[in-house]
Amino acid sequence: MMDSSPEKTNLELLYERVCEQGREFEVVFYPMLPRLYEMMLPSLEARLNFLSVGYRHVAFARYVHGDVDCVHREVMAQKMVLLTSILSKLLNVNGILEHQEYLNTE
């Protein structure tokens, strides 16, 4: 049995309780992108290109306007962080699926 010290997070404590039960759970991946992105950017390559163009526009805006601290820049930075994390998760999931397909080819 694992130690339940107060230094552990709630997630770690929950994981310990689930593991102690000895049950297996099915993992389901739900779509994380808004429906608009799926229609506008149907492929993973299109989403990566969209992100790349966004970074170029930010670089251009910084070059033209300098380091301006405004709400627009903050919103753009937050959206880019969100899209980056979503795309990295998509890449990880695709890598897992490709690896699993490779394992099931025998």
UniProtKB/Swiss-Prot annotation:
GO biological process terms, semicolon-separated: viral DNA genome packaging
Main location: host cell
Pfam families: Herpes_UL33
Source organism superkingdom: Viruses
The entry's keywords: Host nucleus, Viral genome packaging, Viral release from host cell
A cellular component annotation (GO) from this entry: host cell nucleus
Compartments where located: Host nucleus
Entry similarity comment: Belongs to the herpesviridae TRM2 protein family.
Subunit record text: Associates with TRM1 and TRM3 to form the tripartite terminase complex.
Function description: Component of the molecular motor that translocates viral genomic DNA in empty capsid during DNA packaging. Forms a tripartite terminase complex together with TRM1 and TRM3 in the host cytoplasm. Once the complex reaches the host nucleus, it interacts with the capsid portal vertex. This portal forms a ring in which genomic DNA is translocated into the capsid.
This protein's name: Tripartite terminase subunit 2
Organism: Human herpesvirus 6A (strain Uganda-1102)
